[in-house]
Regions:
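Short, hinge-like loop/turn segments at secondary-structure boundaries
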Residues: 55-58, 109, 133-138, 179-180, ...
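Thiamine diphosphate
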Residues: 47-125
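Generic beta-sheet signal
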Residues: 36-38, 84-89, 115, 181-187
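Glycine-rich beta-alpha junction loops
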Residues: 42-46, 122-124, 189-193
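Glycine/aspartate-rich loop-and-adjacent alpha/beta segment that forms the canonical ThDP
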Residues: 166-208
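Active-site-proximal loop->helix
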Residues: 105-106, 127-135
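Active-site diphosphate/adenylate-binding microenvironment
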Residues: 1-75, 80
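Conserved thiamine diphosphate
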Residues: 132-172
Length: 208
């Protein structure tokens, strides 16, 4: 456990860009109170959330996990905010999962919910790419282009921010939670970390 904690904390000051998922989740934990709610979409992001987002209270980090329900983060966040209007609600999703239920931002605005959606943007089906790279050593047909997520947010009467450098993420999260509308944060993410994690775990297994 001490080694895991040390590994986790080693990313706290990492300012490389795109943002490493470990660093993104450290910043998310800083902004969220212990009883605030995180909704994880399905994808590579859920692996990183499970490893690097510390939970202190029951039902404060909801991960669909093995059901593979991509697109759950935004509608899940709407529901969480309606049930717990006094708590901060953060949806963390990949770009692919987000686009599967993006239309629900109309619902979010219409119902007056002010939660934050953090998009881990890698312009691909990140978890599928990860699995292909592990199994075959290469990947096919998993990359795609994205819309301008800031303009997309504005088209739904929401607010959009784009992260241009890693040190902007924490203040942007703080600003986002001060808004009275739904917010989308487009955060380029460094999923080169995925295969590094695979290699690390393989080495760890050899020591057991």
């Amino acid at each position: 456990r001490q080694k895991m904690v040390a590994e986790h904390e080693s990313y706290a000051e990492d300012l490389s860009f795109p943002v490493k998922p470990q660093k993104a989740l450290i910043d998310c934990r800083k902004i969220m109170d212990k009883d605030d709610i995180v909704i994880s979409d399905v994808g590579a992001n859920k692996v990183w959330i499970a490893r690097h987002y510390n939970c202190y209270e029951p039902n404060t980090c909801l991960i669909s996990n093995g059901f593979a329900t991509m697109g759950i983060a935004v509608p899940g966040a709407i529901s969480a905010k309606l049930v717990h209007p006094d708590k901060k609600v953060l949806a963390i999703t990949g770009d692919a999962g987000f686009l599967m239920n993006v239309q629900e931002f109309e619902t979010a605005y219409r119902l007056g919910t002010n939660f934050v959606t953090l998009i881990f943007n890698d312009s691909s089906y990140g978890l599928i790419k990860w699995k292909q790279d592990m199994q075959y050593g290469h990947h096919e047909c998993v990359d795609f282009t994205n819309p301008d997520f800031v303009k997309l947010a504005e088209s739904f009467h929401a607010i959009g921010y784009r992260i241009e450098k890693t040190e902007d993420l924490l203040p942007t999260l703080k600003k986002a939670f001060q808004q009275d509308k739904p917010v989308i944060i487009d955060c380029p993410i460094d999923y080169e970390e995925n295969m590094k994690l695979t290699a690390h775990l393989e080495q760890l297994m050899k020591t057991l």
